[in-house]
């Protein structure tokens, strides 16, 4: 099997994934998964598509992650891994879609408007 690549985005985070056959090692920006994401919850989020299909020990994953925060990066990585797994085997797509791993979350930060301190907040109104 050749190297399969995919892209995942969430908020400002971008994850570029390169999947090849191996032993289940996930390397993010030349660091181990547990070193990059110390939180077990974020590690679980990243591994969700692999665990759903039962292929966690079958592929080595190299990741280039940039932008955003920890949560956004982990969810961008989850989407990228799911897309790469579908490129490898298209029959897995319905199983991943039913769990919501194939859907790009469109929510992002709303822009600040002029004449207001924040996106929705207005300056205090004084009647007199």
From Swiss-Prot:
Residues 97-128 are annotated as: Disordered. Pfam families: Ribosomal_S9. InterPro entries: Ribosomal_Su5_D2-typ_SF, Ribosomal_uS9, Ribosomal_uS9_bac/plastid, Ribosomal_uS9_CS, Ribsml_uS5_D2-typ_fold_subgr. GO terms for molecular function: RNA binding; structural constituent of ribosome. GO terms for biological process: translation. Gene3D superfamilies: 3.30.230.10. Residues 97-113 have a biased composition (Basic and acidic residues). It comes from the Bacteria. Residues 114-128 have a biased composition (Basic residues). Keywords: Ribonucleoprotein, Ribosomal protein. One of its GO terms (cellular component) is cytosolic small ribosomal subunit. Belongs to the universal ribosomal protein uS9 family. NCBIfam families: PRK00132.1. HAMAP family: Ribosomal_uS9_B (MF_00532_B). This is Small ribosomal subunit protein uS9. It comes from Bacteroides fragilis (strain ATCC 25285 / DSM 2151 / CCUG 4856 / JCM 11019 / LMG 10263 / NCTC 9343 / Onslow / VPI 2553 / EN-2).
């Amino acid at each position: 099997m050749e190297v399969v690549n995919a892209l995942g985005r969430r908020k400002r985070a971008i994850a570029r994934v390169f999947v090849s056959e191996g032993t289940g090692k996930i390397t993010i920006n030349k660091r181990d998964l547990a070193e990059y994401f110390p939180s077990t919850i974020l590690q679980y989020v990243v591994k969700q598509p692999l665990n759903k299909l039962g292929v966690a020990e079958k592929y080595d994953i190299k990741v280039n992650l940039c932008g955003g925060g920890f949560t956004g990066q982990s969810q961008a990585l989850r989407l990228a891994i799911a897309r790469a797994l579908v490129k490898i085997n298209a029959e897995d797509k319905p199983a991943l879609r039913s769990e919501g791993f194939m859907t790009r979350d469109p929510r992002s930060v709303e822009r600040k408007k002029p004449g207001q301190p924040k996106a929705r907040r207005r300056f205090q109104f004084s009647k007199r």
